[in-house]
Amino acid sequence: MFGKGGLGNLMKQAQQMQEKMQKMQEEIAQLEVTGESGAGLVKVTINGAHNCRRVEIDPSLLEDDKEMLEDLVAAAFNDAARRIEETQKEKMASVSSGMQLPPGFKMPF
């Protein structure tokens, strides 16, 4: 099944990948992305741990309907969460791109 040194090489690759993934997770935790709604009138910035770092609301919205503003804030947060998820997937996929994985093996991300 594994050629000469194949299992050893696979274990070495797994160790390297684990180290890369840990480093990548630390980098991701430091990332910040901004989601928007209402054509940029509401902006929410979150970090890689999905913690809200900043909320920006255009002053013109403060005079409008409270319910609409709440909806815009929620939509901006959801947009930011979607963006951070996409960024995380892209970065984690780059970790495993150089590995020679067995056919059919899928990474858990």
UniProtKB/Swiss-Prot annotation:
Homodimer. Belongs to the YbaB/EbfC family. This is Nucleoid-associated protein YbaB. InterPro entries: YbaB-like_sf, YbaB/EbfC. One of its GO terms (biological process) is response to stress. HAMAP family: DNA_YbaB_EbfC (MF_00274). Binds to DNA and alters its conformation. May be involved in regulation of gene expression, nucleoid organization and DNA protection.
